[in-house]
């Protein structure tokens, strides 16, 4: 018996919608990363993108434990000398709440072309509305 390897053209991808209201950021992000990679499927193959599309709603209502709401800091560098910038979790939620979930999930995906392809299947929205009704997403309870 030969080992089954998924082919990119035969992978069936489903669309799911997740409500992030009250969900803990890290626990939500790990499950999203797992499903974007396709590890929940029997035909999972490490070098093939077998994951599903995921729509996350209410990103502005995601929860963090402890004092992370005030203490957690996101850093990025502009590329110029002395150009390190920092933004707290509260400021990030106020400015761009989608980015909080995107950063958490992106760090859990593989680095490289395959990981970028997986990340493109994640759609995050701050509010309760999305424009993917034509794909008929199923509700996923995490």
Curated annotation (Swiss-Prot):
Sample GO molecular function, one term: structural constituent of ribosome
Annotated protein name in UniProt: Large ribosomal subunit protein uL13
GO terms for cellular component: cytosolic large ribosomal subunit
Keyword Ribonucleoprotein: yes
Lineage top rank: taxon: Bacteria
UniProt subunit comment: Part of the 50S ribosomal subunit.
Family per similarity comment: Belongs to the universal ribosomal protein uL13 family.
Entry annotated with the keyword Ribosomal protein: yes
Gene Ontology annotations of biological process type: negative regulation of translation; translation
HAMAP family hit by this protein: Ribosomal_uL13 (MF_01366)
Function: This protein is one of the early assembly proteins of the 50S ribosomal subunit, although it is not seen to bind rRNA by itself. It is important during the early stages of 50S assembly.
This protein's UniProt keywords: Ribonucleoprotein, Ribosomal protein
PANTHER family membership: LARGE RIBOSOMAL SUBUNIT PROTEIN UL13M, RIBOSOMAL PROTEIN L13
Signal peptide segment: none
């Amino acid at each position: 018996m030969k080992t089954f390897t998924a082919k990119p053209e035969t992978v069936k991808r489903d669309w799911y919608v997740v409500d992030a209201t009250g969900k803990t950021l890290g626990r939500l992000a790990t499950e999203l990363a797992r499903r974007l990679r396709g590890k929940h499927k029997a035909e999972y193959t490490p070098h093939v993108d077998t994951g599903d599309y995921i729509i996350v709603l209410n990103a502005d209502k995601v929860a963090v434990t402890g004092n992370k709401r005030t203490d957690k800091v996101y850093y990025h560098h502009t590329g110029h000398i002395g150009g390190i910038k920092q933004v707290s979790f509260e400021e990030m939620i106020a400015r761009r709440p989608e980015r909080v979930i995107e950063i958490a999930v992106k760090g859990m995906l593989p680095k490289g072309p395959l990981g970028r392809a997986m990340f493109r299947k994640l759609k995050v929205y701050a509010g309760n509305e999305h424009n993917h009704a034509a794909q008929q997403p199923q509700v996923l309870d995490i």
